[in-house]
Amino acid sequence: MSKGWRKLFVSRGDGTKNSLKKTLKVPEVRSPLLTNFHRWAGKERVLKLTDKEQVTEAVGNSSWDLSKNLFANLLASPMRSDKASRFKFPRDLLIQMKLVQTGNENPGKLATLMPLINMKSGKSSSYVANSLKIFKGKKPGLGQLVPTAVNDSGIANISLSDIVLDKSLFTEKHQEELLQCIENCMTQLVDRRKSSVPVVVEDWDVVLTYDHNNDNDIELVRLKQLPKDPTVIILNLKVVENDSIRALINDKLKNHEVGVVLKFLKDERLIRLVYSLLNFSK
């Protein structure tokens, strides 16, 4: 056999070097959808439609009343990284943690890692999923949740050994503080409701209940028995097993046959607190 027999398997034409088959290469993908997608998290994306007809075609004639929608407002909050999982979530679905200067009750310690019920601005914050189960487990350790930046906390040259890491602050005590804030808001609402007019249930209203016959804590329901079949968010507080809360919801605050009807734009703080407690307690 001739010496050029190998060329028979790769050659075209006359079998010369110039006619050898070249190895095909797949072009490198340059689409930002694939190369830069991980960089988009946390950045606001605005759909800019300047023409009125374009807007109508995209979203219809209704704005869907998203400003009154609890879920829409939660999802619209800025993205933050969960310190435990490293995934990003809307901030209002997480617990914010800060280092707070310690008083005389903890000698030798400079700061305490605290969960915050009311979120505060500042760089010295970290976030973790709003879940009691996470803190009752062995992982993550609280040391992993300490904010990286402590520059604006008023504490300089701090190390992990200088920080009080008390798990009870993130479990029973956090739950108790949430419940106390909810009860305070409800008590204030009792005085406000004394002179209020009869309520009309509308889309995206939040209905508070204390119903052991309902297995769901959070549910989206269309009330077909009411005019215009409004879609409402029901938050059932039976999980707290608290007589004061039960009396407030089933007696003092009840303003409709379906329960305590709240309007997001008027009762936003109470609604957010209840939703946070229910999510935390699951």
Swiss-Prot record:
According to its UniProt record, where is this protein located?
Mitochondrion
Is rRNA-binding among the key words of this record? no
InterPro entries xrefs: Rrg8
Q: Name one GO cellular component term.
A: mitochondrion
Query: Example GO biological process term?
Result: mitochondrial genome maintenance
Q: What UniProt keywords are attached to this protein's entry?
A: Mitochondrion
- Superkingdom of the source species: Eukaryota
What residue ranges carry the coiled-coil annotation? Answer: none
Predominant cellular place of this UniProt entry's protein: mitochondrion
Report the function annotation for this chain: Required for respiratory activity and maintenance and expression of the mitochondrial genome.
* Similarity-based family: Belongs to the RRG8 family.
UniProt-recorded name of the protein: Required for respiratory growth protein 8, mitochondrial
- Taxonomic source organism: Kluyveromyces lactis (strain ATCC 8585 / CBS 2359 / DSM 70799 / NBRC 1267 / NRRL Y-1140 / WM37) (Yeast)
Lineage, highest ranks first:
Eukaryota, Fungi, Dikarya, Ascomycota, Saccharomycotina
